[in-house]
């Protein structure tokens, strides 16, 4: 935990060097009014960060993360406001109408989906592109929810599989108040993205990349989103901090 705090402190130091100048140093009031975003762009390209740190766009649009959101559960029920599809691999296996629960349970080493056996993990997705899946006793999520037998222990593991940028929508607002300044939220978005990429696959033996709690970054799915957070994440799309070439 101490090492984790030191790493985050170093990352924040680098971000301050790259962002703070854009917040406090406009050449003239007239120029600031006519080109409000120009100082930010210039700082991102030219500001001098601590030795070894680089601010760059390095995360591809197609990059995804696997976030562990449940472990050791006997069963999980999910719903979707636009209906759900249950997939085995790339094959659509079952459908459920809008807001009709789908229950996935563990049966020996297999899964059951509304009572029907599956010998392989399943993914539950909205039937509508951009839709959501909600755990009935928890949060709603973008992307897919993958259900599998928990590796090395009893029970089900539930993994949220989604693009990095959409993951950040549900993270940044749990690390910082959505009411903070736009530049502060952008800096936090870069920090959170950098952390996610640097620690990807940390929990691979448990079937996912990151947890949804303080062991990684607190993640609340769609329930953690707000317009100001989404705006900050989109404005810094793909940007991370590297130290000596590594996140």
Listing of model-derived features with the role each one plays in the protein:
Residues 2-247:
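Conserved, single-site charged/polar hotspot
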């Amino acid at each position: 935990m101490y090492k984790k705090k030191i790493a985050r402190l170093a990352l924040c130091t680098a971000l301050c060097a790259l962002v703070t100048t854009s917040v406090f140093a406009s050449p003239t009031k007239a120029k600031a009014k006519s080109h409000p975003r120009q100082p930010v762009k210039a700082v991102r390209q030219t500001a001098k960060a601590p030795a070894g740190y680089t601010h760059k766009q390095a995360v591809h649009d197609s990059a995804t993360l696997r976030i562990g959101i449940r472990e050791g559960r006997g069963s999980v029920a999910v719903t979707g406001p636009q209906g759900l599809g249950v997939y085995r691999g790339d094959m659509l296996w079952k459908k459920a109408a809008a807001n009709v629960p789908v229950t996935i349970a563990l049966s020996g080493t297999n899964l059951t989906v509304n009572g029907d056996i599956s010998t392989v993990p399943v993914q539950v997705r909205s039937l509508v592109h951009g839709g959501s899946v909600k755990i009935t006793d928890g949060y709603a999520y973008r992307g897919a929810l993958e259900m599998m037998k928990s590796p090395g222990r009893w029970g089900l593991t539930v993994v949220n599989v989604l693009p990095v940028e959409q993951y950040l929508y549900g993270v940044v607002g749990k690390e910082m108040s959505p009411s903070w300044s736009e530049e502060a939220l952008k800096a936090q978005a870069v920090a959170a993205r950098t952390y996610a990429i640097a620690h990807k696959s940390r929990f691979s033996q448990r079937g996912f990349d990151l947890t949804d709690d303080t062991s990684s970054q607190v993640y609340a799915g769609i329930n953690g989103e707000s317009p100001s957070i989404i705006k900050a994440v989109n404005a810094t799309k793909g940007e991370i901090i590297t130290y000596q070439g590594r996140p």
